A protein has these predicted regions:
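A glycine- and Lys/Arg-enriched "phosphate-lid" helix/loop adjacent to the NTP-binding pocket
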Residues: 143-220
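Glycine-rich phosphate-binding loop used to anchor ATP phosphates in small-molecule kinases
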Residues: 97-178
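P-loop (Walker A) phosphate-binding loop of NTP-binding proteins
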Residues: 41
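Extreme N-terminal, non-catalytic leader segments
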Residues: 1-34, 68, 74-76
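Conserved substrate/cofactor phosphate-moiety recognition/catalytic segment
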Residues: 55-105, 148
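Post-Walker A alpha-helix
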Residues: 49-50, 54
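Conserved lysine of the Walker
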Residues: 46
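Hydrophobic anchor at the beta1->P-loop junction of P-loop NTPases
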Residues: 38
Length: 231
């Protein structure tokens, strides 16, 4: 069972080959490799925390959140996807018309994250003994925090939520992603809202504090409730 640990609020500011099932998609099969997911609210300081970790040791490798895919921006080393060729900033579309785009965004966010987290590790990482790979969020928070919050707030219908849960469970059973631990960057909703305004990401300028409060409650329930189990 993966370990969970919470980090208190600090001063943080703001063509690769896919591994085939035959190679066991769970890359923790690499000897000595540890896989840790860093979780937290929007603007909790995850990117800064991960950058500091990466700079602190050559044994640390970071898989960042694929947000550029959601913004329709071609990031270095990635090919342009069919959705990008069609145009559209899906992150912005979700924030502007959440009920219309909730299912589309939550589906694509999870699938793009899954793709990023299943890429074959660089040789220098895979060959290094006792290395650790840190992930900016996981497919578990995609479901248990963001998608579930959309359902609870009425942005996802019962039918959409049931379909989401069905394919999400199937993918995790078919493409196992084991995590050895979860690090939770616990930050107050007010602080994350202030940081979000400060960093000035255009899509986030109208995000309400109440939305961050709801996400905070979901993180607390998932990561700090000892009775809760990942499904």
């Amino acid at each position: 069972m993966a370990k969970r640990c919470a980090a208190g609020e600090g001063e943080l500011q703001g063509n690769e080959e896919m591994i085939s099932p035959a190679k066991k998609l769970c890359t923790s099969a690499v000897s000595g490799l540890r896989r840790i997911a860093v979780e937290g609210n929007i603007a909790a300081g995850k990117s800064t925390f991960l950058r500091l970790l990466k700079e602190s040791s050559p044994a640390y490798h970071v898989i960042s959140e694929p947000i550029t895919k959601w913004q329709n921006v071609d990031s270095p080393g990635d090919s342009v996807t069919a959705s990008q060729q069609c145009g559209g900033n899906l992150l912005d579309m979700f924030y502007r018309e959440p009920k219309r785009w909730a299912y589309t965004f939550q589906t694509y966010a999870c699938l793009s994250r899954l793709k990023a987290q299943l890429r074959q590790l660089p040789q220098e990482v895979a060959s290094q003994p006792n290395s650790t790979i840190f992930f900016e969020r996981s497919v578990h928070s995609d479901k248990l925090v963001f998608a579930e919050n959309c359902h609870d707030s009425g942005l996802l219908s019962d039918v959409e939520w049931n379909i989401y849960c069905d394919w999400h469970s199937f993918l995790l059973e078919s493409l196992p992603l084991h995590f050895d631990a979860f690090i939770y960057l616990k930050t107050t909703p007010q602080t994350t809202w202030e940081r979000m305004q400060k960093r000035g990401r255009p899509e986030e300028q109208d995000v309400a504090l109440d939305y961050l409060k709801s996400l905070h409650e979901k993180h607390e329930k998932w990561l700090l409730d000892s009775e809760n189990k990942m499904k």
